[in-house]
Amino acid sequence: MTQSNEIAAELAHRIQADNEHFGGTMPEATAISWRGYLAAMLEWNLIAVAAYDELRAQVPAVKDDPAIAILRGRG
């Protein structure tokens, strides 16, 4: 089974590739997708909290981030 740090490294590579693809300005829809994907990885214990925080910092902020609302629960 792939180790958490290997998964985090692969995700970092993919995020960097997307940032380069979009000329350093990732569109909001892509950022929302990445944030949701990272939240799922965290929830299923595929990456550690520290890795999640580091990876999320590489993705542009999203106002009223739906991934955070889903991850934490709405109620």
Each model region followed by its residue ranges:
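Acidic, Ser/Pro/Thr-rich low-complexity regulatory regions
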Residues: M1-G75
